[in-house]
């Protein structure tokens, strides 16, 4: 392409973008990380793939599993790799809806909250908030003892698992079952929930962000 042709093409792009900014955008398919099944999450627009990097998406676990009991669970993912029109995410966090948490607390019960920092065996550092609801009111000594139990369970389980195994236990309710068993040795429990997870530090391989541009060869191969 000659310099004159390049200039004309550039001017056409400017004209189009002024008339309709969406004309230069492409739609990218966003997927969950492989350790969460690599399922399709959403389609998002961007004028160039670099602008997708580190963008955060929030979806309900219900959108992935179609299990109604998962409606209160919000998952956060962050795009860190783009390959053509495919964007790959990494897990960023989890949180229960406020309405659901409020529904757990009833008159005559106690709420025991614990915040624990854990590290998986493959190097993910996360802060986890746990919520336990007792069947009746308990004292501060019992609350402290229960927090200690929950701390021990969470740190031990995380250290024994990689991120995929750990999140599988969280999302399938296996981790809360272990916390329930540990906590009820201190006082009778009605419910235990993982209220929030926030990733504090990724392992080196997850820190990297990459973009593989869509090329003519890529389109032809697809």
From Swiss-Prot:
| Listed GO CC annotations | ribonucleoprotein complex; ribosome
For this UniProt entry, the molecular function terms from Gene Ontology, in alphabetical order, are: structural constituent of ribosome
Domain of life assignment: Archaea
State if Ribonucleoprotein is listed as a keyword. yes
Q: What UniProt keywords are attached to this protein's entry?
A: Ribonucleoprotein, Ribosomal protein
Q: Which InterPro entries match?
A: Ribosomal_eS1, Ribosomal_eS1_arc
Which SMART domains does the record match to this protein? Ribosomal_S3Ae (SM01397)
Q: Please, one GO biological process term?
A: translation
Would the keyword Ribosomal protein turn up in this protein's UniProt record?
yes
Tell me which family the UniProt entry assigns to this protein.
Belongs to the eukaryotic ribosomal protein eS1 family.
> HAMAP family attached here?
Ribosomal_eS1
| Annotated protein name in UniProt | Small ribosomal subunit protein eS1
What organism does the UniProt record list as the source? Pyrobaculum islandicum (strain DSM 4184 / JCM 9189 / GEO3)
């Amino acid at each position: 392409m000659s310099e004159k042709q390049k200039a004309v093409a550039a001017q056409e792009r400017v004209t189009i973008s002024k008339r309709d900014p969406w004309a230069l955008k492409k739609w990218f398919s966003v997927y969950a990380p492989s350790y969460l099944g690599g399922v399709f999450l959403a389609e998002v627009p961007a004028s160039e793939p670099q602008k997708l990097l580190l963008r955060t998406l929030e979806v309900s676990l219900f959108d992935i599993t179609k299990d109604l009991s998962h409606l209160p669970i919000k998952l956060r993912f962050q795009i860190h790799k783009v390959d053509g029109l495919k964007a790959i995410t990494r897990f960023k966090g989890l949180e229960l809806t406020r309405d659901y948490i409020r529904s757990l607390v009833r008159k005559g019960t106690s709420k025991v909250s614990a915040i624990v920092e854990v590290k998986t065996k493959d190097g993910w550092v996360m802060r986890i908030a746990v919520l336990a609801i007792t069947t009746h009111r308990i004292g501060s000594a019992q609350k402290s003892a229960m927090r200690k139990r929950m701390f021990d369970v969470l740190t031990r389980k995380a250290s024994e698992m990689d991120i995929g195994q750990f999140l599988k236990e969280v999302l399938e309710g296996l981790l809360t079952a272990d916390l329930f068993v540990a906590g009820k040795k201190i006082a009778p429990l009605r419910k235990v929930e993982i209220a929030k997870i926030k990733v504090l530090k990724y392992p080196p391989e997850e820190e990297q962000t990459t973009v593989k541009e869509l090329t003519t060869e890529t389109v032809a191969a697809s």
